[in-house]
A protein has these predicted regions:
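Short, well-formed alpha-helical segments that are part of the catalytic scaffolds
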Residues: 15-34
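A conserved acidic beta->alpha catalytic loop
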Residues: 45-58, 101
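Glycine-rich, basic loop-to-helix element that forms the pyrophosphate-binding segment
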Residues: 72-89
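Short aromatic/hydrophobic "clamp" motif used to bind/position activated sugar donors
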Residues: 93-94
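Conserved donor NDP-sugar-binding/catalytic core segment of glycosyltransferases
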Residues: 106-137
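Short, flexible, basic/aromatic active-site loop/helix in glycosyltransferases
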Residues: 125-126, 140-157
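Acidic donor-binding loop at a coil-to-helix junction in glycosyltransferase catalytic cores
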Residues: 183-194
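Non-catalytic, C-terminal membrane-associated alpha-helical segments of glycosyltransferases
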Residues: 227-231, 246-314
Length: 314
């Protein structure tokens, strides 16, 4: 049987303990995949985006030849993801997973099986956010950490890169990389996946591939989730703006997301007001979430970007 080569790409930034724990789980799944007769030879790549290379010792402590370490000092998620694309240039497939995620059993084989069925350009799996048990109920009922699901094989128009398998031959043929303009703001995966589809690629959903993300307490707050809602709206509009190929298309994009933003602000504010009136946390929280996304879209339509992952120079 011909052998396909697969690289599991783990991007990391100053999470050595989580990285070490996650790698042990990933390596167990790599062992299963390599031995199960699918004809796939898998290995692991860790891309360390810390300028001082803080993950090097964590990788070295594993003493496992299946794990390669790459230091990418240029700040930003886009730089890290593009480094993974470059380091995996001799592979057929690249599976992205983040350093704060833990894959469930079958995560990797499910991605591969879904890809083998129709050979799409990309396969997106689920990321399940485990919110702390003592989190503000308002945050939970607001659905800030809920994500849509689809039947396996469903084609989708946009994908996140937290659990994403790429057919590298197709990605290279389409000439798509992660845009550095969104490296510190987030949303680089939105633009990347939309560009894949625009150039003729296909992205399909895999519901059986699941990675868990344990949400830190500092992120399960009203302030953080509302800021993230704004950022999601902002990056969605910016991605559309960056996809525009000329002045006319940029004008259309700005108008489109100005109108969408205003509609969300109006609808979200109304739902929030109803929630306050009837004492419904669900309507109040979801209304504010919608309104904040709309505000982010308005800013994105103007070209304003918020670098959520900006780093201190100190």
């Amino acid at each position: 049987m011909p052998v396909l080569t697969l690289v599991v790409g783990v991007l990391t930034y100053r999470r050595a303990d989580q990285l070490r724990a996650g790698l042990s789980v990933i390596l167990a799944q790599v062992s299963i995949l390599n031995a199960d007769g699918r004809g796939v030879a898998a290995r692991v790549l860790v891309v360390d985006n810390d300028p001082v290379g803080s993950a090097r010792s964590a990788v070295a402590s594993l003493a496992d030849s299946r794990v390669k370490y790459a230091h990418e000092p240029v700040p930003g998620i886009s730089a890290g993801r593009n480094r993974a694309l470059d380091e995996a240039s001799d592979a057929d497939l690249l599976a992205f997973i983040d350093d704060d995620e833990t894959p469930r059993p079958g995560w990797l084989t499910a991605l591969v099986d879904t890809w083998l069925s129709t050979r799409p350009t990309a396969v997106m799996g689920r990321v399940f956010f485990n919110v702390p048990a003592d989190a503000d109920p308002w945050v939970v009922t607001g659905g800030f950490f809920a994500r849509p699901r689809h039947p396996t094989g469903t084609e989708i128009a946009v994908a996140g890169a937290g659990n994403l398998l790429l057919d590298l031959r197709q990605v290279r043929a389409l000439g798509v990389r992660f845009d550095p303009r969104l490296g510190l703001s987030g949303g680089e995966d939105t633009l990347f996946s939309r560009l894949l589809v625009r150039r003729g690629g296909r992205i399909v959903w895999c519901d059986e591939s699941v990675a868990d993300d344990n949400v830190p307490a500092k992120r399960a707050t009203r302030q953080w989730v509302l800021q993230r809602a704004w950022r999601v709206g902002n990056c969605t509009a910016l991605a559309d703006l960056y996809l525009a190929g000329n002045v006319a298309e940029r004008c259309v994009s700005r108008v489109r997301y100005t109108l969408r933003g205003l509609a969300r602000i109006a609808g979200g504010t109304l739902r929030y007001a109803v929630g306050r009136l009837v004492g419904s946390d669900r309507h109040e929280a979801r209304g504010l979430r919608t309104a904040r996304r709309g505000q982010g879209m308005l800013s994105g339509a103007r070209g304003t970007r918020f670098d959520e992952y900006a780093r201190s120079v100190a």
